[in-house]
C-alpha cells in the first residue's frame, strides 16, 4: 500500500512518485489549495492538493484530523522561502495526484492543542501513541532491545527463556497468583524475577545467560514502578563481581553511545557506607555538587541538646549540608524546607546563613548561633567549605533519619536552586551493601534477596555475627536512578541454609519452598554471579522522560489498573467454580 514512510522523504526523493499511508496531523484549507501534514511512525511530511487534480482536491476538503488516508503524489523541493528547518522533511513536499480515505475519525477525545490529563491519555492509549513524541520513545525502546541482544550475542551470552508459571518465593514483594484448574486449591505465581531459574541454568552448565523478560510484583506503585515490568536479566558462571561489572558497564556505555552519542567514560565505584555518608542515599545523584559533612565531633560539648545528644550517641549523627548561594532563601522557604524534612523523620532544620565569614559570629544569621562559639562556627565553615552567600543546613538525629532527611533535602534543593547539572550524565557503581537489615520486628531481612553471597565470611562466621555481614552485591546508578542491581550468588548448600536460618526460615519451610535449590546445590554448583537491568527505567533515562509510563506501550495506573481495557475485572461465576474459587466480600462498616 505504501512505497515510502512520510518521515523518511528527503531531497534525494525529488521527482519520484511515492505512495504514502498514514494519518492527517493537521489540515489547512486555502480555498484553491489544501495543505495537510501527513504523519506516520517515522514523522511528518507536508502534502498539498491543487486545482489541476480536481478530484483529489475535492476529496481533501473532507479531511479532518486523524483520518487514516493513502496519498500518491510527486516529491517536490520547496522554495527556499518555504523551507521549514524545524521539520526533518522541511525541504520537500508532496504534490498529491490521488487520495484515498481509508477510514474516517470521529471527534477526538484527546486534544492535540492542549495538555491532556494522564487519565485520558491512558484510556485512549491507542490515540496517545500516535503522538510523535510517544512513537519516538517506543522506537527508541525497540532500538535499545536490539542493541542489547546484539551486544549479548557478541559476548557469548545465550538467550534462554524461563517459566512464567512458577512457585511463590519470598523476594520482598507480594506475588501475583494464578489458580490451577487441574490442581484445585493450588496456585502458580507469576515471577518477580527469573532469579532461581537463572541460577539453575548456571548449575546446568550454561555459563552466560541473558533474557529480556517480563516480571511481576504486586506492590504499591510509584511514578517509576509498574506491576509488570521488563528486565534485562543476566547471569554468569566463573566470573568475579568486578568482571561482571566490567561487562555490564560496557553494555550500558554501548547503549548511551549508540542512542545518545554520549561516552559515559569509566564508572566510579563507591561503597554503600560512603554513599550514605556523603549523599544520604544508596543511589546518589552525582550531578548535584552538595555533600553531607559530619560535624558531630565539633558539637559534643555545646549546650544545645539537639546537637549534643546525637553528637555523643554512637547511633546518632550530626551532619551539615552546604548550599551554595543558599543565603538568599527567605524565611518562608526555610520553614517550608523544615516541614519537608519532617516527612523523613527529622524534627526540624537548624541552619546558618553565611553573610560575611570575616566577621565571625557577627557575619552569620542563625537561630542556634547563641549556642555556638566563634571557634566552633569557624570550624564548621572551614570543614564545609562555606563561602559568603552560602547556607548551611543541619541534620541531628539517629543516622538513618539524618541520611534520609538531608539526602532528600539535597535532591530537592538541587532541583529548586538549579544546582543539579541537568545536561550531565553521572553513572557509578555502589557496592558492599549490608547483607541484612532490621525488619522492624526484632528479626532480619535480606537487603537484596536471600541468594546473595556474603563477602569474605564462612557460614559459621556469618551465623555468629550476621549484623556485620557485607553482601557481595552491586548496584548501577545513573543520575540518581538505580538502573540495575546484582550480586555474587551463594553456591554452597551450607551457606544457603545458614542464610535461610538467619532470615527465620526453618528447615521444614526451606524444604517446602526451596528444596529443589538445596538439592541442586549438592551436585557441583559453579560459582556464579549476575545482574538485572530495568529496561523500562533505562529507556526512561535515554528518552528524557521522568515518567516510566511514557516508555511502556500499554502501562497500568498507580492503582495497577488499565483504564483502556478496564482490567482487572470480575470473573464470571462459572469460571470461578471451575477453578474452585469463592470470592468473599468484605462486610461494610456500619
Swiss-Prot record:
Residues binding L-aspartate, per UniProt: 171, 217, 448, 489
Gene3D superfamilies with a match to the protein in the record: Bira Bifunctional Protein, Domain 2, GAD-like domain, Nucleic acid-binding proteins
Keywords from the UniProt entry: Aminoacyl-tRNA synthetase, ATP-binding, Cytoplasm, Ligase, Nucleotide-binding, Protein biosynthesis
Binding site for ATP: 217-219, 226, 482, 534-537
Functional note: Catalyzes the attachment of L-aspartate to tRNA(Asp) in a two-step reaction: L-aspartate is first activated by ATP to form Asp-AMP and then transferred to the acceptor end of tRNA(Asp).
Protein family: Belongs to the class-II aminoacyl-tRNA synthetase family. Type 1 subfamily.
Name this polypeptide is given: Aspartate--tRNA ligase
The organism of origin for this protein: Salmonella arizonae (strain ATCC BAA-731 / CDC346-86 / RSK2980)
High-level lineage: Bacteria, Pseudomonadati, Pseudomonadota, Gammaproteobacteria, Enterobacterales
